[in-house]
Amino acid sequence: MKSKRRSGCPLSASLDVFGDRWSLLIVRDMMVRGYRTFKEFRTSGEGIATNILADRLEKLEAAGIVETEPDSDGRRVGYRLSEKGIDLAPVLLEVVLWGARHEKTSTPAALLEQMTMNREAFLAETRRRWKDRDLTPMIPRLDMRRRHKNE
C-alpha cells in the first residue's frame, strides 16, 4: 500500500506511515502490553472504533510495521510487530517522556523516572521481549481516561 509521498523529507515519510491519531497507540499496545488480537486492541481504553482499528491494522501491515499470524487457537488472526515495528521503540519512549513532561498524564512517577534514567536498558528489554515473543505486559495498564493539564 504505497501512497504518493509529499516530499523526500524523512519526517514527512515517517508521518505518512504512523502519523495519524491511532497507529502509535496500536504499536504501544503491542510493544508494552503484549496485545495480539483485535479484541484486545478494542479493550485498550482508548475508545477506537472497530472500523478505524481495522483500517489502521491493515495500514500498519501494508507498511511492514505489523505482521499477521494465526492465533494460538487457529481460529483468528494475531498481530505481531515486525523488525521495522520494534524499531519504533525509541520513538515511542521519547513521545511518552515528552507527553509526561508537558501534559498531565496518569503515568506513575517511578515508571517515568525508570524510563528517563535507564533509557537504553528499557529499550534493550523491549527488544528482548519482542525477540523472545514474551507477551506479558511490560508496564501496568494505566488509567486511560482523558486528563487535562488544568484538572
What would you call each of these model-derived segments?
Residues 5, 14, 29, 64-69, ...:
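Short, contiguous, well-ordered secondary-structure segments
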Residues 9-49:
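N-terminal helix-turn-helix DNA-binding core of bacterial DNA-binding proteins
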Residues 19, 72-94:
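Basic, amphipathic "hinge/linker" alpha-helix immediately C-terminal to the N-terminal HTH DNA-binding motif
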Residues 39, 58, 77:
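Residues within the helices of the helix-turn-helix
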Residues 44-68:
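Canonical helix-turn-helix DNA-binding module
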Residues 90-151:
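C-terminal regulatory/oligomerization modules of transcriptional regulators
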